[in-house]
Swiss-Prot record:
<keyword id="KW-0479">Metal-binding</keyword>
<dbReference type="InterPro" id="IPR034291">
    <property type="entry name" value="TMP_synthase"/>
</dbReference>
<dbReference type="GO" id="GO:0000287">
    <property type="term" value="F:magnesium ion binding"/>
</dbReference>
<feature type="binding site">
    <location>
        <position position="89"/>
    </location>
    <ligand>
        <name>Mg(2+)</name>
    </ligand>
</feature>
<feature type="binding site">
    <location>
        <position position="70"/>
    </location>
    <ligand>
        <name>Mg(2+)</name>
    </ligand>
</feature>
<comment type="pathway">
    <text>Cofactor biosynthesis; thiamine diphosphate biosynthesis; thiamine phosphate from 4-amino-2-methyl-5-diphosphomethylpyrimidine and 4-methyl-5-(2-phosphoethyl)-thiazole: step 1/1.</text>
</comment>
<dbReference type="GO" id="GO:0009228">
    <property type="term" value="P:thiamine biosynthetic process"/>
</dbReference>
<feature type="binding site">
    <location>
        <position position="69"/>
    </location>
    <ligand>
        <name>4-amino-2-methyl-5-(diphosphooxymethyl)pyrimidine</name>
    </ligand>
</feature>
<comment type="similarity">
    <text>Belongs to the thiamine-phosphate synthase family.</text>
</comment>
<keyword id="KW-0460">Magnesium</keyword>
<comment type="function">
    <text>Condenses 4-methyl-5-(beta-hydroxyethyl)thiazole monophosphate (THZ-P) and 2-methyl-4-amino-5-hydroxymethyl pyrimidine pyrophosphate (HMP-PP) to form thiamine monophosphate (TMP).</text>
</comment>
<feature type="binding site">
    <location>
        <begin position="37"/>
        <end position="41"/>
    </location>
    <ligand>
        <name>4-amino-2-methyl-5-(diphosphooxymethyl)pyrimidine</name>
    </ligand>
</feature>
<keyword id="KW-0808">Transferase</keyword>
<feature type="binding site">
    <location>
        <position position="108"/>
    </location>
    <ligand>
        <name>4-amino-2-methyl-5-(diphosphooxymethyl)pyrimidine</name>
    </ligand>
</feature>
<feature type="binding site">
    <location>
        <begin position="134"/>
        <end position="136"/>
    </location>
    <ligand>
        <name>2-[(2R,5Z)-2-carboxy-4-methylthiazol-5(2H)-ylidene]ethyl phosphate</name>
    </ligand>
</feature>
<feature type="binding site">
    <location>
        <begin position="186"/>
        <end position="187"/>
    </location>
    <ligand>
        <name>2-[(2R,5Z)-2-carboxy-4-methylthiazol-5(2H)-ylidene]ethyl phosphate</name>
    </ligand>
</feature>
<feature type="binding site">
    <location>
        <position position="137"/>
    </location>
    <ligand>
        <name>4-amino-2-methyl-5-(diphosphooxymethyl)pyrimidine</name>
    </ligand>
</feature>
């Protein structure tokens, strides 16, 4: 039963681009995307604060669901829509502070054991990955594939879920067919020959999410 310890999110979050700059946040919001994540890696809080502030302001202007990856203190300070954390970040994060601030929480998982850990935290949504091989980041685990993804989605049938990892435009329909509520994409948009067209096509497949 979906009873998160954090504010809920729509069951279907739709197309969910993960990008590393405010410029991409603004472009994608302007293109009609309504769920997205700012993921800037390996910088100190003070180095990314201006970008976090700008991204949150854009998210508010477009009435979008903007998640901040990892920088949970800044997300709380500037009242982001939500925070996304990897498994390795859960132990080092003050989840009570995120909850008290009224922010949504998304958590990454890579197998059944990590899903158990995520469920214990009762987040707003659970990300399932990586579905396919990915060049975006180094992954210690093997790709799950569509069958494993479908099994996880079935297990979490009443929970908002996000598929991530190596999802291209060509693979997106098969991923959505598993019943997952959202697809997170990175290079499918940022490395596309025509990012506007790729975004429009992915929105056609995954939607903008439920209100």
């Amino acid at each position: 039963m979906y009873q998160p310890d954090f504010p809920p999110v729509p069951f279907r979050l739709g197309l969910y681009p993960v990008v590393d700059s405010v410029q991409w946040i603004e472009r994608l919001l302007d293109a009609g995307v309504r769920t997205l994540q700012l993921r800037i890696k390996d910088r100190r809080d003070e180095e990314v604060e201006a970008d976090v502030v700008a991204a949150i302001a854009l998210g508010r202007r477009y009435n979008a669901r903007l998640f901040i990856n990892d920088y949970w203190r800044l997300a709380i300070k500037h009242q982001a829509y939500g925070v996304h954390l990897g498994q390795e970040d859960l132990q080092a994060t003050d989840l009570n502070a995120i909850r008290a601030a009224g922010l949504r929480l998304g958590v990454s998982t890579h197998d059944d054991m990590e899903i158990d850990v995520a469920l214990a935290a009762r987040p707003s949504y659970i990300a399932l990955g990586h579905v396919f091989p990915t060049q975006t980041k180094q992954m210690p685990s093997a790709p799950q594939g569509l069958e494993q993804l479908a099994r996880h989605v079935e297990r979490l049938s009443d929970y908002p879920t996000v598929a991530i990892g190596g999802i291209s435009l060509a693979r997106a329909p098969a991923v959505i067919a598993t019943g997952v509520g959202s697809i997170a994409v990175v290079s499918a948009i940022t490395q596309a020959a025509d990012w506007r067209l790729a975004t429009a096509q992915l929105l056609e497949i995954a939607g903008v999410g439920d209100e």
